[in-house]
Amino acid sequence: MSITAEEKARVMKEFATKEGDTGSPEVQVAILSSRIATLTEHFKTHKKDNHGRRGLLKMVATRRKLLDYTKAKDEARYQDLIKRLGLRR
């Protein structure tokens, strides 16, 4: 249900703003998006996993807050991020 260390490192490298960047909103949103995609696949086969679904909803809310923060601080970075992640909006 979680992403592997290699997948997480790949996402961090792709979305990092500088070397060693792990905490920027772009990286955090990208990691959350990867975890959300993994959990979405999990729920296709495990429909009754309501405890896991709660965790998914918390991740979606966290991602939404980070996206709102990014949009408030820098609209261009926000537009670039949602385009690179393929998020609708």
From Swiss-Prot:
Keywords assigned by UniProt, alphabetized: Ribonucleoprotein, Ribosomal protein, RNA-binding, rRNA-binding
GO terms (BP aspect): translation
GO molecular function: rRNA binding; structural constituent of ribosome
Domain of life: Bacteria
Pfam family, one: Ribosomal_S15
Listed SMART domains: Ribosomal_S15
GO cellular component: cytosolic small ribosomal subunit
Assigned protein family: Belongs to the universal ribosomal protein uS15 family.
Chain's role: One of the primary rRNA binding proteins, it binds directly to 16S rRNA where it helps nucleate assembly of the platform of the 30S subunit by binding and bridging several RNA helices of the 16S rRNA.
Binding partners and assembly: Part of the 30S ribosomal subunit. Forms a bridge to the 50S subunit in the 70S ribosome, contacting the 23S rRNA.
Official protein name in the record: Small ribosomal subunit protein uS15
Gene for this chain: rpsO
